[in-house]
Every structure is written in structure tokens, then in C-alpha cells.
Amino acid sequence: MRILPVVAAVTAAFLVVACSSPTPPKGVTVVNNFDAKRYLGTWYEIARFDHRFERGLDKVTATYSLRDDGGINVINKGYNPDREMWQKTEGKAYFTGDPSTAALKVSFFGPFYGGYNVIALDREYRHALVCGPDRDYLWILSRTPTISDEMKQQMLAIATREGFEVNKLIWVKQPGA
């Protein structure tokens, strides 16, 4: 019996399931009365849970713009100081239901989608707390490269209340930080 085809099939099935869940984690509430047009533009990544696709990157930003098909273009960019170069990835996002609810699915790789859920957002759309499909993905975003200690504590309190292990956050090096 050849084991390689079996391993490949199991791996492919795992990737489809792991990367296609666009729902928020159980018990986590996403933002309602969401206005996607106000969310568009550039956001600075203030903190994140560490993952291989962003490991070692500084000066990380995410820029969102409208797509012709009603979705949202996503451009993530970060500086890799070890390689002394910028890295960029482009993706697309779509609402999983009502666009006034901040639950989206995002893809950076073909047909594979993962959750992008805005779980906290200030009235001015200047600070956001975003999670993925489970509690292993969390980001604190801001329209500016730095945030106040007060805003940092607010975001940490919300993340803790929603069941995220905030001690796992890494704080991203940004200009002026």
C-alpha cells in the first residue's frame, strides 16, 4: 500500500477544513452596524498572535479597498529586517452574511478562505480588534502606528473577556513606536 497518496489526501482534507471556516470562534460576538466603507484604507498592526505567515515582520500594515464584485481587496505588507526587504501579499474578502455584521471570509491562496471577524471597533473607526476562525488568531489594529496606553488596555480587556490569551500577543515594531 502506498502511504504517500493517503497522507496527501488527509493533508488536503485538513487544509480545506482548517482554511475554509469563515465563522467567528464560538462565543465571540462580532461588531454589528458595521460600515465597510469607513473601514477601508490602511491599518497598522499594533499587536498579533505570532504565525508563520507574519513571523519576524515589522511595520506591518493592512490596506482595504472595494472590489468591483462587491468584495474587499486586501493588501498586507510588512518589513523583514533579516532579509532587509518588504514582503507583500494580496487577498480578497467577502461578507459571510449581512454586510452590517463584521464577519468576513478572506483568502490569500486560491479557494481557501479563513475567518476575518471584527470583534471591537471604536466609533471613529480608528482602532479595531480582529480575530480569525478560532482563538489562535488575534490582531490589534490602528489607523496610526501607535496607540495610547488607555486604548491598549481597552483592547486587551475585550480580548480577555472574549477568551483570548493576551499574553501570547507580540507587539509589532512600527515607525515612531
Swiss-Prot record:
Keyword Signal: yes
Keyword match Oxidoreductase: no
Membrane topology designation: Lipid-anchor
CDD domains named in the record: lipocalin_Blc-like
Residues covalently joined to lipid (S-diacylglycerol cysteine): C19
Transmembrane segments annotated in the record for this chain: none
GO terms, biological process: response to stress
Highest taxon of source: Bacteria
One GO CC annotation: cell outer membrane
Primary location: membrane
GO molecular function ontology, one term from the record: lipid binding
SUPFAM superfamilies with a match to the protein in the record: Lipocalins
Subcellular location: Cell outer membrane
Residues with lipid group (N-palmitoyl cysteine): C19
Pfam families: Lipocalin_2
Alphabetically ordered keywords of this record: Cell outer membrane, Lipid-binding, Lipoprotein, Membrane, Palmitate, Signal
Signal peptide as annotated in the record: 1-18
UniProt function note: Involved in the storage or transport of lipids necessary for membrane maintenance under stressful conditions. Displays a binding preference for lysophospholipids.
Family that this chain belongs to: Belongs to the calycin superfamily. Lipocalin family.
Assembly and interaction partners: Homodimer.
Protein name per UniProt: Outer membrane lipoprotein Blc
Source species of the chain: Citrobacter freundii
